Structure formats: structure tokens, C-alpha cells
């Protein structure tokens, strides 16, 4: 007796199956734009770690500001770590330093933030750039408040402190400006 042949396999034509085509397009990330202009990310790009990049030009001067911020944070951090007395003297004009440890800890924290700033300079991911700009704005805002409170307690006022306060306010404004510019949705043409 001859062995029975199994029935031939039926091939599914996914090209004609609409549900299957939709699933395939969703997984591959082909097409799929919603009403707001957002392009849906595919599962593959999520696994590979691709982020939504700038779809238009970056705001004018953003990279220059990121570079200036990274240099500023690094410079002050190194000065606080290596020369805490001179940094304190430059800000508070001749006031005596009682302990160098808090100033050096401040330098270590600034050095950590500066590493984040340097890394953000070389990325095109909007989320990372926005977080670093928000970090800068918060840092400069807190520094402005702390120096203002210190002035109110001690009553010391000098040109150096006034320049520090004005520069911190300016840096907050610039960081917030770029934060919102990077977060803006591109205009549809």
C-alpha cells in the first residue's frame, strides 16, 4: 500500500490580505503619519534605538550655545576643584573662605554636568538636547536665587556679584529660548 501524500500546503498571499499588509507596514514603520504630522516609529527602529531627529534645521546658534555652556561649566568646575579660594574671592570680593570642601564638591558637581554638556554637543536627538538645556536653565536659576539670598544675608554688594547675577539671568533666558525652539514642531508647508 502506497503512503498517502499530504495535501499541498496553501500559501497565504499576504499582499492581498489587508490586515496582514497593515501589520507589516506598522512593524516596518512604512508610512503612518497622524493628523499632527508625527511619523509613527517602527518596532525595528525602537529596538535599534533610533530617536526622532531634527526634521528641519536646528535653531540658529544652538551648537555655539552648547559649546559655550560646556566650556563655561568645565572652566568653573576646574577652577573650583583646583583653586577654591580664588573662585570664592572672585565672586564675593575678599570674603574669607571657612572651608574649601563645599567649593570643591561644587566643582565636582559642575564637572559632572559639564560632561553631560559635552556629550549633548555631539548628538542630534531632540530629547537629549532639550534635557541638557533645561538642566542649564535650572542650574543658572538656582544659582541666581542662592547668590541673591546670600547677598540679602550678608549685605555684600560688588560689581562682580552684579555681573554674576545679570549673566545668570541672561543664561537662563538663552537656555529657555533654545529649549522651546528645539521643542517646536516643524511648520507644515
Curated annotation (Swiss-Prot):
The keyword Cytoplasm does not apply. GO terms for cellular component: membrane. Its main location: membrane. GO terms for biological process: negative regulation of cell population proliferation. It is a multi-pass membrane protein. The keyword Phosphoprotein applies. Signal peptide: none annotated. The chain crosses the membrane at residues 64-84, 109-129, 131-151, 156-176. This is Tumor protein p53-inducible protein 11. Keywords: Membrane, Phosphoprotein, Transmembrane, Transmembrane helix. It is found in: Membrane. Residues 85-108, 152-155 are extracellular. Induction: By p53/TP53. Residues 1-63, 130, 177-189 are cytoplasmic. PANTHER family: TUMOR PROTEIN P53-INDUCIBLE PROTEIN 11. The modification Phosphoserine is found at residue 14. InterPro entries: TP53I11 (IPR028266).
